[in-house]
Amino acid sequence: MTAGRSAGPNTVEQKAEAPVADERILRTSPLKKLLARPELGSVVGALAVFVFFALIADGFLRAASLSTVLYASSTIGIMAVPVALLMIGGEFDLSAGVLVTSSALISSMFSYQMTANTWVGVGVSLLVSLAIGAFNGFMLTRTKLPSFIITLGTFLMLCGMNLGFTKLIDGTVSTKTIADMQGFSSARAVFASTVSVGGVDFKVTILWWLALVALGSWILLRTRVGNWIFAVGGNEDAARAVGVPVAKTKIGLYMGVAFGAWISGQHLLFSFDAVQSGEGVGNELIYIIAAVIGGCLITGGYGSAIGSAVGALIFGMTSKGIVFAEWNPDWFKFFLGAMLLLATLLNAWVRKRAEATT
């Protein structure tokens, strides 16, 4: 009897200790965490592209050349970050490319026609851009139509308005120059200036790009909104069932894309003083491809802001690397398609490996 009673506590202690041992066994190693990162495939691809052009293109490794690569990457990356967040949330925006042009046209024509300070036009452009983004999100959540249809309609409307209003107001397909208007110099300093570091000139868009990457990563990884984005993209019905504000999340994501389009549009305007109303068509696909190369799933619920930045960097290295290698630039789209296929396959393999190790 005594032996039986004394064995009882030991048995309980052994049972209690068992889960502790299991938890130690199930701890994720740093390698497994690395394999689970969405941007792993794009980082491998970026390193391969960098080494490739470093070997075959004379001058690719020069500081001035790398500055050019970063600038080309930033013009795509500014839009790729919010587009990636939208794709993680399970949606697309086919109007993103022409919205960049729309925001530039609004700033230019409002300032010129109203003889207002350039910053007034910039502010009006921001409000209108955000309203267009909110419209996309509102129509999506209220009609339940696919985002492809909603944003394709917005794309066509913006294309028509860009051309129609520009011809109606300015009489041509381009805006009047606003270089001599009040506030232009300070606005150019914010959106299109050049910063010299160690004798090498870098465009300010690189800083905008890095800031958006940092902001996007913080939202996804450190905030409740980031959890909502992943939840909505993974399973919208399940997210709604646990109290996630699905409609507000999607409207906010579309407004985020509109904000990125506004920044890109102001850079376009203040870089050239005037805007061609037909620009931007087709760029929406480039932003989506950069996000996919960076690890975003077409179906949503998976991806990262850093991955989209790496995808944009691959674009920049390829577009400028072909020039430095003195190849025919017509080959760029071939490389673009090949990178998309390879990156998609590599990202799918990385995701399967990540799922297998968890």
Regions found by a protein language model. Give the residues of each.
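Loop-to-transmembrane alpha-helix initiation sites
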Residues: 147-149, 203-208, 250, 282-284, ...
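Cytosolic-side transmembrane-helix boundaries in multi-pass membrane proteins
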Residues: 1-51, 55, 234, 241-248, ...
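Transmembrane alpha-helical segments in multi-pass inner-membrane proteins
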Residues: 261-262, 271-337
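Single transmembrane alpha-helix segments in multi-pass membrane proteins
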Residues: 49-114, 138-144, 291-306, 338
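Transmembrane helix-bundle core of multi-pass membrane transporters
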Residues: 148-223, 249-252, 271-280, 355-358
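Hydrophobic core segments of alpha-helical transmembrane domains in multi-pass membrane transport
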Residues: 42-54, 83, 158-163, 208-218, ...
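Alpha-helical transmembrane segments within multi-pass membrane transporters and channels
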Residues: 115-156, 310-311
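Helix-loop-helix "hairpin" substructures at the membrane interface of multi-pass membrane proteins
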Residues: 117-126, 130-136, 197-275
